[in-house]
Amino acid sequence: MEMPRRFNTYCPHCHSHFEHEVEKVRSGRSSGTKWDARRTRRGKAVIGNAGRFSKVPGGDKPTKKTDLKYRCSECGKAHLREGWRAGRLTFQE
């Protein structure tokens, strides 16, 4: 799917329509231990299944939702919107 890099849309900070630049959200730094690792560690000292899942959590979906950030050209602030499913997303210059 192709999408324009810049287009006019509403800015919730300026309360008006201005040109926005679209960028993909980069992943942040990962935290120490995730919730499932903490849960497993809690279960190690008990009788039973030691905090494991009875069924393995599901795999990946065939397409991912878009994760985009819209940056206002007027105030410079960025906001997020709900993503949609797209196989491949490219930006038009």
From Swiss-Prot:
Q: Does the keyword Ribosomal protein apply?
A: yes
Q: Zinc finger regions typed C4-type: which residues?
A: 11-75
What the record notes about the co-factor is: Binds 1 zinc ion per subunit.
**Pfam families in the cross-refs:** Ribosomal_L44
Gene Ontology molecular-function annotations: large ribosomal subunit rRNA binding; structural constituent of ribosome; zinc ion binding
- Record's keyword terms, sorted: Metal-binding, Ribonucleoprotein, Ribosomal protein, RNA-binding, rRNA-binding, Zinc, Zinc-finger
Q: Which InterPro entries match?
A: Ribosomal_eL44, Ribosomal_LSU_eL42, Ribosomal_zn-bd
Highest taxon in the source lineage: Archaea
Listed under GO biological process in this entry are: translation
An example of a Gene Ontology cellular component annotation for this protein is:
ribosome
The positions annotated for binding Zn(2+) are C11, C14, C72, C75
Required cofactor(s): Zn(2+)
Provide the assembly information. Answer: Part of the 50S ribosomal subunit.
Q: Which HAMAP family match?
A: Ribosomal_L44e (MF_01476)
Family, per the entry? Belongs to the eukaryotic ribosomal protein eL42 family.
Role this protein plays: Binds to the 23S rRNA.
Q: What is this protein called?
A: Large ribosomal subunit protein eL42
Q: Which organism is it from?
A: Natronomonas pharaonis (strain ATCC 35678 / DSM 2160 / CIP 103997 / JCM 8858 / NBRC 14720 / NCIMB 2260 / Gabara)
The protein's gene is named rpl44e
